[in-house]
């Protein structure tokens, strides 16, 4: 059940047609929301395939980045980190104005092979770059520290005893994202502070990648235990 | 109880007289080992204070970095990241040759205020710099992802249901460090691979620092949950 700070059904934009985008899109449809999947072109093959599979819902739509951002009351950035600023520029600052913009991206640089490095320093983050470039959007960094299946079904693992991290400058926007996370099944959500905390969750990615290797599965997550 | 791959009593060098160094030194004394705390000068005030408090054991010693490294069969680097290479140079490559060198340091740069940034990129780590500079030492990165009290008494928190991470190029050295961790009470130890994985655990520090703020205590740690 979606709690009070989120309307029971809302319009969501998902920018990006990869696994993260379609996984979140499907979860939102399952919860009764309307979803537009946005990509660079209207005839993106992955978007059309997703739309075909989701047509029965009557609430699945496809369009350009700009179409989707105009459609959504809340916007998810699910593009690759290296494409994020450009994709959001195509979405259009005007279409993002005043909206909660959930940034799931990571500043991964795959150009030098595996494991990828980060294209940000520890004094910078993609979350901050997004907030700076789209100053009137209410950016919340979230969903960037676990694999796609766990993002939307956290209770699959350890009965949900693991943690989601959020950060952002807008307290009301973070409350909405917390509500959304709870509607996905998240029990443990840690608010790390303002958008500069994106440095922290993005810099966790090198450890996430090594743990992926050590665990031999992407179905793992971390639980913060405290006294 | 220390298991088969570690002798029941051994000689340890601790380089660095801060909280991490003295906390580990006291734990090693409590387990019956001999310990020399090394610092830049023989008359370091913190080292002498520690020695006074530990004299009853008959197994506590102080000396220069070089004295300690010569004394220890296993060497702990517990100096600040910014001082690590210089401290190890003073310890002397010859005194480190063939020895297990446990590197607990983090590449934190406090010069621009709090929170500290990292002075390494995601394609580099202090662990690798140490291994490269002291090629005949058997470097194992460990103990750099939790607060000092938890390093030596992990069962204080959540009955020890949280994780220590190690990495290094020498399998036998990592086995010795795993034995040592178990003798300290660690139940969950994840081997992340070769020394390049130090990039991962060192890059976790920005998240550790934000979690410290969010948890309002340093008595927290992370547990990796997996399917």
Stretch-by-stretch model annotation:
Chain A
Residues 80-83, 146-147, 170-171:
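Short beta->alpha connector loops
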Residues 150, 161-227:
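Active-site-lining helix/loop region of Rossmann-like oxidoreductase modules
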Residues 97, 105-156:
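Rossmann-fold NAD(P)-binding glycine/threonine-rich loop
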Residues 2-51:
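NAD(P)+-binding Rossmann beta1-loop-alpha1 motif at the extreme N-terminus of oxidoreductases
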Residues 23, 27, 133, 180:
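Rossmann-fold NAD(P)-dependent oxidoreductase module
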Residues 55-102, 106-114:
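Rossmann-like NAD(P)-binding element
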């Amino acid at each position: 059940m979606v709690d009070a700070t989120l309307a029971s059904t809302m319009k969501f934009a998902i920018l990006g047609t990869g696994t993260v985008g379609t996984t979140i899109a499907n979860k939102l449809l399952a919860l009764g929301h309307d979803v537009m999947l946005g990509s660079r072109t209207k005839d993106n093959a992955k978007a059309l395939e997703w739309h075909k599979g989701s047509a029965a819902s009557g609430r699945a739509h496809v369009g350009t980045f700009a179409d989707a951002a105009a459609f959504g009351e809340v916007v998810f950035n699910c593009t690759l980190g290296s494409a994020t600023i450009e994709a959001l520029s195509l979405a259009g600052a005007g279409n993002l104005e005043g909206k909660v913009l959930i940034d799931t991206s990571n500043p991964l640089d795959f150009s030098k092979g595996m494991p990828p490095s980060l294209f940000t320093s520890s004094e910078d983050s993609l979350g901050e770059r997004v907030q700076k470039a789209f100053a009137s959007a209410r950016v919340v960094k979230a969903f960037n520290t676990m694999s796609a299946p766990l993002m939307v079904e956290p209770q699959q693992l350890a009965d949900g005893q693991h943690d989601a991290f959020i950060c952002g400058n807008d307290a009301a926007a973070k409350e909405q994202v917390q509500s959304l996370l709870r509607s996905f099944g998240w029990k443990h959500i840690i608010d790390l502070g303002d958008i500069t905390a994106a440095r922290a969750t993005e810099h966790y990615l090198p450890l996430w990648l090594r743990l992926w290797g050590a665990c031999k599965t992407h179905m793992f997550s971390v639980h913060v235990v405290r006294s």
